[in-house]
From Swiss-Prot:
This is ATP-dependent DNA helicase DinG. Keywords: 4Fe-4S, ATP-binding, DNA-binding, Helicase, Hydrolase, Iron, Iron-sulfur, Isomerase, Metal-binding, Nucleotide-binding. It comes from the Bacteria. Its EC number is 5.6.2.3. One of its GO terms (molecular function) is metal ion binding. It comes from Escherichia coli O6:H1 (strain CFT073 / ATCC 700928 / UPEC). Binds 1 [4Fe-4S] cluster. DNA-dependent ATPase and 5'-3' DNA helicase. Unwinds D-loops, R-loops, forked DNA and G-quadruplex DNA. Gene3D superfamilies: P-loop containing nucleotide triphosphate hydrolases. It catalyses: Couples ATP hydrolysis with the unwinding of duplex DNA at the replication fork by translocating in the 5'-3' direction. This creates two antiparallel DNA single strands (ssDNA). The leading ssDNA polymer is the template for DNA polymerase III holoenzyme which synthesizes a continuous strand; ATP + H2O = ADP + phosphate + H(+). Residues 517-698 form the Helicase C-terminal domain. ATP binds at A54, P55, T56, G57, V58, G59, K60, T61.
């Protein structure tokens, strides 16, 4: 479709009207360029997909929404905007789209959150009830749902009242009532525990109400994990050919895709035996009480028992083999080099893939049959079986995917990382098996790039070391396929608005020197606090260990420090804003996650402290396997993995400072390697152009370090 004169006029009219809605709106050339590039791509005038880096201040959200909505209307398609996290998803849904609705009054939009963000009305009713019959019913359905105390019951009753009177839409983030994680776990549900259309509350269920709204919406705000799942199952979202897709925070996509495709399962032999026994009994109950018209051959008791016995023997053999690779009787981990399994293990995995897939098919057949039963049956008993069969289906589905992935030598042209872990829980040792591909470009090509005609991938940071090459390698986007890569200029004058400060540290921030380095950092930080030049400050660390050691050095300043983990992030930011507004000094302290999505302008943040260059951890199974693979290709892992990742992290950290034309301040980086190592210049060259200062550092007095037992990493 060409960009017609009428379409261009519509986009221009909305953009002009928007300027009247935003106080102090400043027209910016990069924003106009982004609107034009997005429009050309979505209309099919230029290229297949567009990766566009839009630095802070460009106004990227409105720059893709305006042309996206106009073209979606013209082509009668749905515009899907996907983000990496719930916070940005909610911001677009609650702030940006309502703003656009002022200039597009008939705009219809909705949000598609994951099932776990919504309350389950069935569970809420049980927890809000004082009637024991409700709780007895849930117990019969194998759901232990009782309030822990009267206060919790009253809280749930208030939530139910708000839901029933439409004061609350059922989203966890949209209520002011405090809901701790333990209570929310019981209030929400997952796919395996949902009765779907068989549930009494189906028509009023917030999750399904939201899903039905998608069919009527012009704009759907989703997240990357949900989009990946929807493309895999062809559910939730409209047909890919009828979509326009924008992937905001697109730099997260490869990691989200990899996480979505990672498979893990417990394979402890006694536990596995119990699951198989429960399933055979479940099938027997279905055959006895709700016999299907057509009997699946595998449901015949003798055949099912023999099938499960073979499956158990394979699992038991695998337990014995894997345990040989790990020290006996304790928590441990074993990774298979280059993802290459011994022949014996590979043969077991291949056979397990076939056997678990057959059980998955049997569970699905019974579940479909049970779901079609009429009201002439005992509905409570039927629902109990549906829930149990649904959970069995979820287990065998995950197992089938795990063993299929374990059977692959490569995925997306790279090895599949495979490892086993032994973990202690409540005094018992449990064995787990894990698989994940180190590259997901083929899967992204199949699910997204080839399926959806035109996609916009955008973020304030898409490049590392001034290059799109890392994004191209990890995502599979490529110029040869017609994909375009654009980096917009920043609208800010960084030279005038701020500076980078690299203190003259005596030591590098290596593990051996960590204590002295943090002591020096704390001394310089204390000097900055005492100067009283800055009201709002942010301190970013590469590890929780280093953050804790720093806090040990500044205990007398603890009252002004708002530390990640003390409270939910949004509450820390709220408190920070209030303090600065009252003229008080306030310091946010956190890890890399605080370097994303934190938008504090002016005095709210005028000094950022960065502990050190944040190279990625090198001890995870995925990173180690990727390193082995790169070396086998005569590629240097530091250049391919570590340095681009560090550059990316540093760009994001430094990007916290200048958020508007009125922002000012300093970025203090406590890492002399930026000036002494060859790669330091490359890292600095990828940052906005700030003047650099190198002040002296007061001597830090090293504290005696208490011996602490470092926690063992359980997962990658």
């Amino acid at each position: 479709m060409a960009l017609t004169a009428a379409l261009k006029a519509q986009i221009a009219a909305w953009y002009k009207a928007l300027q009247e809605q935003i106080p102090d709106f400043i027209p910016r050339a990069p924003q106009r360029q982004m609107i034009a590039d997005v429009a050309k791509t979505l209309a099919g005038e230029e290229g297949r997909h567009l990766a566009i880096e839009a630095p802070t201040g460009v106004g990227k959200t409105l720059s893709y929404l305006i042309p996206g909505i106009a073209i979606a209307r013209e082509e009668q398609k749905t515009l899907v905007v996907s983000t990496a996290n719930v916070a940005l998803q909610d911001q677009i849904y609650s702030k940006d789209l309502p703003l656009l609705k002022k200039i597009i009054p008939d705009l219809k939009f909705t949000a598609a959150f994951g099932r776990g963000r919504y309350v389950c009305p069935r569970n809420l009713t049980a927890l809000a009830s004082t009637e024991p019959t409700q709780q007895d019913l849930l117990a019969f359905l194998d759901d232990e749902l009782t309030p822990n105390n009267q206060e919790e019951q009253k809280r749930c009753a208030k939530l139910k009242g708000d839901l029933d009177t439409y004061k609350w839409d059922g989203l966890r983030d949209h209520t002011d009532i405090a809901i701790d994680d333990d209570l929310w776990r019981r209030l929400s549900t997952d796919k395996a525990s949902c009765l779907n259309r068989n549930c009494y509350y189906y028509r009023e269920c917030p999750f399904f109400v939201a899903r039905r709204e998608i069919q009527e919406a012009e704009v759907v705000v989703a997240n990357h994990a949900l989009v990946m799942a929807a493309m895999e199952s062809e559910a939730v979202l409209p047909d890919p050919k009828n979509l326009l897709l924008v992937l905001d925070e697109g730099h997260h996509l490869p990691d989200v895709a990899r996480d979505a495709l990672e498979m893990s399962a417990e394979i402890t032999a006694p536990w596995y035996r119990l699951q198989l026994d429960l399933f055979t009994k479940l099938v027997a109950t279905c055959m006895e009480q709700f016999r299907p018209k057509t009997i699946p051959p595998l449901a015949i008791p003798e055949r099912l028992n023999a099938h499960c016995e073979e499956l158990y023997e394979l699992i038991a053999s695998l337990n014995n083999i894997l345990n040989l690779y790990m020290p006996a009787g304790q928590e441990a981990e074993h990774r298979f080099a280059m993802g290459e399994l011994p022949d014996e293990v590979l043969e077991i995995c291949q056979r397990l893939a076939k056997l678990t897939e057959m059980l998955r098919g049997l569970a699905e057949l019974f579940l479909n049959d049970l779901s079609e039963k009429t009201g002439s049956h005992d509905i409570v008993r039927l629902h109990r079986l549906i829930l149990q069969m649904n959970r069995a289906l979820g287990m065998f589905e995950a197992q089938s995917k795990l063993w299929r992935l374990a059977s692959l030598a490569q995925s997306s042209g790279a090895p599949v990382t495979k490892w086993a872990t032994r973990e202690e829980r409540e005094g018992q040792l449990h064995l787990w098996f894990h698989c994940v591909g180190i590259r997901v470009s083929d899967q992204l090509e199949r699910l997204l790039w080839r399926s959806i005609p035109h996609i916009i991938v955008t973020s304030a940071t898409l490049r590392s070391l001034n290059s799109f090459s890392r994004l191209q390698e990890m995502s599979g986007l490529k110029e040869k396929a017609g994909d375009r890569f654009v980096a917009l200029d920043s609208p800010f004058n960084h030279c005038e608005q701020g500076k980078i400060v690299i203190p003259r540290m005596r030591v590098e921030p290596s593990i051996d020197n960590e204590e002295q380095h943090i002591a020096e950092m704390a001394a310089f930080f204390r000097e900055q606090v005492e100067s009283k030049k800055h009201l709002g400050m942010l301190v970013l660390f590469a590890s929780g260990r280093a953050m804790q050691r720093f806090l040990d050095y500044v205990t007398d300043l603890r009252l002004m420090l708002l530390v990640q983990g003390d409270q939910p992030r949004y509450r820390l930011v709220e408190l920070h804003r209030k303090r600065v507004a009252n003229g008080e000094r306030s310091v946010l302290v956190g890890l890399q996650s605080f370097a994303e999505g934190l938008d504090l302008k002016g005095d709210l943040l005028s000094q950022v402290h960065i502990h050190k260059i944040a190279f990625p951890p090198i001890d995870s199974p995925v990173v180690i396997t990727e390193g082995e693979w790169l070396k086998s290709l005569n590629r240097y892992p530091f250049e391919v993995q570590s340095l681009p990742s560090a550059s990316f992290n540093l760009i994001q950290q430094v990007g916290r400072l200048i958020r508007s034309h009125g922002c000012w301040g300093e970025v203090v980086i406590y890492d002399k390697r930026l000036l002494t190592k060859n790669y330091g210049k490359r890292l600095l060259d990828a940052l906005p152009v700030f003047p650099i200062e190198q002040p002296e550092v007061p001597e830090g007095i090293v504290k005696k370090k208490e011996k602490t037992k470092s926690p063992r990493r359980r997962r990658r």
